[in-house]
């Protein structure tokens, strides 16, 4: 049986793989077997970490909101979970990202939201929004 020269197609496939891993360190960008393994590993990690990034940012926003809520002038203890529960009761449509940005950039605004929530005792008598 005669030998088949792979030629253009195999070269193109390997070149494409090498371009992907060209910035990898050491032998991770040289031998084609290791290159193939590292490419699979990199794509797997990228896919996993796209979801992880969403979780991490949500945790960060919750931590920032909680820190801002607990730093009140009067020293009244108010937790994040109560704050979010009361926001939903008052039908305030503010997501955690926006609340975290308000907490960092403009503390007075988060205090005013906080005070409005605490002021109204009976939610059914006062359905107006901020």
From Swiss-Prot:
PROSITE patterns associated with the record: RIBOSOMAL_L20
Keywords: Chloroplast, Plastid, Ribonucleoprotein, Ribosomal protein, RNA-binding, rRNA-binding
Superkingdom as given in the UniProt entry: Eukaryota
UniProt-annotated location(s): Plastid, Chloroplast
SUPFAM superfamilies (UniProt xref): Ribosomal protein L20
Entry annotated with the keyword Chloroplast: yes
First-listed, main subcellular location of the protein, grouped into a coarse class: plastid
GO biological process, one term: ribosomal large subunit assembly
Gene Ontology molecular-function annotations: rRNA binding; structural constituent of ribosome
InterPro entries attached to this UniProt entry: Ribosomal_bL20, RIBOSOMAL_L20_CS, Ribosomal_protein_bL20_C
The keyword Chloroplast appears for this protein: yes
GO cellular component entries: chloroplast; ribonucleoprotein complex; ribosome
Classification via NCBIfam families: rplT_bact (TIGR01032)
Function noted in UniProt: Binds directly to 23S ribosomal RNA and is necessary for the in vitro assembly process of the 50S ribosomal subunit. It is not involved in the protein synthesizing functions of that subunit.
Family under the similarity heading: Belongs to the bacterial ribosomal protein bL20 family.
Protein's name in the database: Large ribosomal subunit protein bL20c
Natural source organism: Fagopyrum esculentum subsp. ancestrale (Wild buckwheat)
Lineage summary: Eukaryota, Viridiplantae, Streptophyta, Embryophyta, Tracheophyta
Gene that encodes it: rpl20
